[in-house]
């Protein structure tokens, strides 16, 4: 959030703060620094309405597993942050040999599906930001009210 005030002063468009915002306190801080809104994506991954798989939810809630995230292109061909697993570790987070979007997701589909039937998330895309501390098994409405400080 250190750059947020400078960005707000430098542009003439509304700024949406994102990255690590997982509590009402952080939402309030971003708004007080000039953000027009906040984006709190990871906080919603364990909400009742989310289609996040059980393997993904387990990884998000496991502090040992979730401690390691990386920006990777191996699942989609485009960079996105996810929990580090076997595929990211062995191929590397950003791999020149990863197929371009949207072909990369097709390349791992069979491997991912087989591993998941065996209870393994080694080849699954488990998208997540660096701060999963706000994730909880609640409704999206409850999460929104919590983040709003209501």
Task: Give the positions of each predicted feature.
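Conserved active-site-proximal phosphate/metal-binding subdomains
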Residues: 2-16, 22-150
């Amino acid at each position: 959030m250190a750059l947020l005030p400078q960005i707000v002063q430098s542009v003439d468009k509304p700024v949406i703060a994102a990255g690590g915002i997982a509590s009402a306190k952080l939402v309030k801080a971003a708004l007080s620094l000039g953000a027009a809104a906040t984006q709190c994506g990871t906080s919603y991954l364990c909400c009742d309405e989310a289609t996040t798989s059980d393997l993904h939810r387990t990884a998000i809630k496991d502090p040992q597993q979730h401690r390691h995230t990386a920006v990777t292109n191996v699942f989609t061909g485009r960079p996105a942050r996810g929990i580090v697993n076997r595929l990211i570790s062995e191929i590397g987070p950003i791999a020149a040999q990863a197929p371009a979007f949207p072909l990369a997701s097709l390349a791992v589909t069979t491997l991912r599906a087989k591993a998941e039937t065996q209870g393994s998330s080694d080849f699954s895309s488990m998208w997540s930001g660096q701060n999963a501390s706000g994730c909880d098994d609640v409704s999206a409405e409850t999460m929104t009210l919590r983040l709003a400080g209501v």
